[in-house]
């Protein structure tokens, strides 16, 4: 159960994170420039991965989505581990779990300041992607992280799954890349 402080922080984080994302998107669309990187495909990929490392976490983009998105990180975590970036993957997960515990919920996004928010809204795949990342990175949960995730799993089952284990017919964010 979230404390009053956590609830206030969560709401402030949600508002600030969403406003920042929208501002960055508009600014980059109309005033940004396209950067070109030198090298072959492998060298360009290495430059991008290195530049996405924020010091505490992997951000999703060099552009306007320059904060942590659980879904995007989940899709690349295994590849990052296999290409020698396991240390940064583990550090990202530790950082994300700390932010999630501080806000008392798992969300789709976390900004640089640690504000957790759902953009554009809650998503049914956020917690599963987090669990996937923990497995593929062989992350060793501490006691408080395990307790937090057990609570989040119970909350997830109540919110998203019916008594048969199927996803409830409710509205939630979807992966826009999959929409034709």
Where does each model-flagged region fall?
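Low-complexity, Ser/Thr/Pro/Gly-enriched N-terminal "stalk/linker" regions
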Residues: 2-68, 90-91, 95
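Aromatic-rich carbohydrate-recognition surfaces in CAZymes
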Residues: 66-73, 77-165, 175-179
């Amino acid at each position: 159960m979230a404390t009053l402080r956590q609830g206030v922080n969560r709401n402030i984080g949600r508002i600030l994170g969403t406003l920042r994302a929208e501002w960055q998107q508009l600014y980059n669309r109309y005033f940004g420039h396209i950067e070109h990187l030198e090298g072959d495909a492998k060298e360009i990929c290495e430059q991008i991965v290195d530049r996405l490392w924020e010091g505490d976490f992997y951000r999703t983009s060099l552009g306007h989505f320059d904060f942590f998105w659980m879904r995007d990180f989940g899709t690349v975590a295994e590849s990052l581990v296999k290409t020698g970036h396991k240390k940064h993957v583990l550090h990202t997960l530790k950082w994300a779990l700390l932010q999630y515990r501080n806000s008392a919920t798992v969300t789709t996004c976390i900004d640089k300041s640690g504000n957790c928010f759902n953009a554009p809204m809650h998503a049914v795949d956020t917690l599963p992607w987090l669990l996937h990342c923990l497995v593929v990175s062989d992350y060793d949960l501490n006691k408080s992280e395990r307790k937090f995730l057990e609570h989040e799993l119970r909350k997830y089952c109540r919110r998203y799954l019916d008594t048969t284990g199927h996803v409830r017919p409710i509205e939630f964010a979807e992966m826009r890349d999959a929409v034709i």
